[in-house]
Design a protein with these regions (language model features):
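Beta-rich, blade/repeat-based domains predominating
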Residues: 1, 31-48, 76-90, 139-141
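Short loop/turn segments immediately following beta-strands, especially the blade-tip
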Residues: 14-22, 119-125
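Beta-propeller fold detector
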Residues: 22-31, 70-73, 127-137
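Blade-level signature of beta-propeller repeat domains, shared across WD40, Kelch, NHL, RCC1
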Residues: 83-141
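Short, solvent-exposed loop/turn segments at conserved positions within beta-propeller repeat blades
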Residues: 6-9, 54-55, 103-111
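Loop/turn-rich, solvent-exposed surfaces of beta-rich toroidal or solenoidal domains
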Residues: 9-14, 22-26, 30-67
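Conserved beta-strand positions in repeat-built beta-propeller and related beta-rich domains
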Residues: 1-7, 49-54, 93-100
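Flexible "stalk/tail and boundary" regions
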Residues: 60-70, 86-87, 92
Length: 141
């Protein structure tokens, strides 16, 4: 299991027990270079991580060992997340942001905030489904 910690520019790796939900053995898989903030990510069928990198105008595919496999440049500075979709899971969807950009930066990046879609030769894995819990019956909140 992976976890992105954006401000310190790290992606962590954990052992995950699917039966119990327990995580253990946290390690830092990689740290991005200065100015490249890993944000939302996904994993493909070969176990490679696709990391949208805030302020870096790119999505990076990392090997399971944390080595850069390739870089997908984008025409916007703030990609936020990558996910595979379509029935064959061979389309890469990348969300981006424009909120908080100064007007001149927004003008320089007219595609900021758009969804980018790329057909790939790589197969993704389906993101796990989420089932919300009924918080009205909990002691939280």
């Amino acid at each position: 299991m992976y976890h992105t910690d954006t401000p310190p520019r790290r992606i962590h790796c954990y052992d995950f027990d699917a039966a119990s939900g327990a995580i253990s053995n946290q390690t830092v898989l990689l740290r991005t270079e200065r100015g490249c903030f890993p944000d939302g990510s996904t994993v493909d069928a070969k176990g490679y991580i696709w990391s949208a990198q805030w302020a870096a105008s790119r999505v990076v595919r990392y090997s399971p060992e944390g080595e850069i496999d390739f870089i997908l440049p984008l025409p916007v500075s703030h990609p936020t997340c990558a996910a595979f979709g379509r029935p064959d899971l061979n389309m890469l969807f990348i969300t981006t942001a424009y909120q908080g950009m100064m007007p001149e930066a927004r003008e320089a990046e007219p595609e900021a905030g758009n969804l980018f879609i790329f057909q790939t030769d790589i197969t993704g894995i389906a993101d796990p489904l989420f089932r919300p819990i009924d918080l009205s019956r909990s002691r939280i909140g």
